[in-house]
Amino acid sequence: MFIIGLTGGIASGKSTVAGILKDLGAIIIDTDRVAREVVAPGRPAYREIVAAFGPRVLRPDGQLDRPALARIIFNDATARELLNAITHPRIRELVQKRLEDLRRANPEAIVVIEAPLLFEAGMEGMVDAVWAVTAPAPVRLKRLMARDKLSLAEAESRLRAQGEETARLRRATRVIPTGGDLEATRASVRAAWQELQRHLADDPEPGGAPWV
């Protein structure tokens, strides 16, 4: 099994790239969905979040109010670190279990872990290659405002909270730009996929080739 860590800043186009990779045959583990499982009512992380942040992060039905929680953590680094400390270990644990299940069921699979905080969550050791998705800041701002119905100031605050992406790009084995149109993104992803397929055909052991 070959595992790709797909990462990138907020509104960089990760989900679009993951969708293209799924169409090409990859199995996707979406850590945002994993996180939703981790913080479901009744789970330990849910109880810790409510204890830490109080009823202001709950909806009337008892579910976490994710937009309310996002407003808090994107404007408070200490709160963000606290939330990450609660959720990241549990997300890692569940992702590792999914990988073990997949390895038994489909040892020849190419698996993509879609994780915006791949490095911050300590998951880089799980993967054979890191593909980083990137787009210019103005493009990301426009996407974020449209997607999450944010003001310009709110969108800028969320981009700032994630910090510079230079370090992330430097640690990646492949960078996929998404600032152009969708067909250009598809072409970049297909090229990366085809190169990976060639490497796997030549040497199926990740440690034996310069993985991309």
UniProtKB/Swiss-Prot annotation:
Task performed by this protein: Catalyzes the phosphorylation of the 3'-hydroxyl group of dephosphocoenzyme A to form coenzyme A.
GO terms of biological process kind: coenzyme A biosynthetic process
Chain residues that bind ATP: 11-16
The encoding gene: coaE
Cellular component GO terms held in the UniProt record: cytoplasm
GO molecular function: ATP binding; dephospho-CoA kinase activity
Keyword ATP-binding: yes
CDD domains: DPCK
Protein name per UniProt: Dephospho-CoA kinase
